[in-house]
Amino acid sequence: MAERLTKTAARNVFYGGSAFFFAIFVGLTAHSHYYIRTVSTDETTLTEGVARGKHIWEKNSCINCHTLDGEGAYFAPELSNVWIRWGGDKDPSSARDALHAWMAAQPSGIEGRRQMPQFNLTDQEVDDLADFLQWVSKMKTQNWPPNQAG
């Protein structure tokens, strides 16, 4: 057995290793795509209200202050679990009423506290935002973000 690696052997190791890791990369990419499409996000529950709520979320730049699944600014509370924190999983109408009241009461005017601006959303827009937050709360995020307090 040769004590040195020949050019042919080195080339074979390079091509074999490259092919192996390329196959691993393709496999992991396909698995991630499959997981996202079939498990993580349930497209069957997407409604027009959810889509309009997402549009309201983006139009008003909510992510500039809030986080959603850990993404966004950390100025205001995490909102991916606000629907559950407000009891929407047990009593959706009370959670909707709470969201309507919260949005109508902003800014709260409490001195020294961070203030959420008044966006003057219509009742339909608040309902659509509630649909979006309800949909987000049902995404399977593998317990991310770790801070559930909001």
How should these model regions be labeled?
Residues 1-48, 102, 132-150:
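Post-cleavage N-terminal segment of exported redox proteins
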Residues 48, 55, 69, 73, ...:
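Extracytoplasmic electron-transfer domains, predominantly the class I c-type cytochrome c fold
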Residues 54-60:
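Local sequence-structure signature of Cys/Sec-based thiol-disulfide redox active-site neighborhoods
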Residues 18, 53-54:
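Short N-terminal secondary-structure initiator segments
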Residues 62-65:
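Short cysteine clusters
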